[in-house]
């Protein structure tokens, strides 16, 4: 591992924007190197103290749904090259699982999540801040495909959630956080030019840190 602190790349954007595709493209390029992915989705607040009817009301697209205090604590530990135990969220029980995932520190940390740029404390820990900007129509189609196929949701429930929760939260919190990004990537994982530029930039930063 390097003698300097790791490089932190923040990748934000709305649900279905292609964040995961961009993250995977960057991760795959540096595969075999010292790199890890830390997803904000794993850091939803523990709700085990609440009855199920209350948990079902959780707005997963609101900043208050996330335990950013724990995420920041873990990120700071990884920056100090210390192992952390990443929590696991159980979407069927709508609370944190008892399972944990040990995460070893690496020289490159990709922090991914819909609202990572909304919290200035997280922004301060990032070396590069990206926002994946994708048309709303494409985002809802991707979300429908994912939720129906992978999570067993009905089309009506996905549309209802999008209209009443996802879209207003995107407009209120996610879209405004775009102004804090260093780079805005349109078209998500399909934008190979932007991804290649990012890979080159990250490689340059890593080289500079090694030579310090």
Curated annotation (Swiss-Prot):
Pathway: Pyrimidine metabolism; CTP biosynthesis via salvage pathway; CTP from cytidine: step 1/3; Pyrimidine metabolism; UMP biosynthesis via salvage pathway; UMP from uridine: step 1/1. Its main location: cytoplasm. It is an enzyme of class 2 (transferase). One of its GO terms (molecular function) is cytidine kinase activity. It is found in: Cytoplasm. Its EC number is 2.7.1.48. Keywords: ATP-binding, Cytoplasm, Kinase, Nucleotide-binding, Transferase. It catalyses: uridine + ATP = UMP + ADP + H(+); cytidine + ATP = CMP + ADP + H(+). The keyword Lipid metabolism does not apply. ATP binds at residues 13-20. GO terms for biological process: CTP salvage; UMP salvage. GO terms for cellular component: cytoplasm. Belongs to the uridine kinase family. HAMAP family: Uridine_kinase. NCBIfam families: PRK05480.1, udk. This is Uridine kinase. It comes from Bacillus thuringiensis (strain Al Hakam).
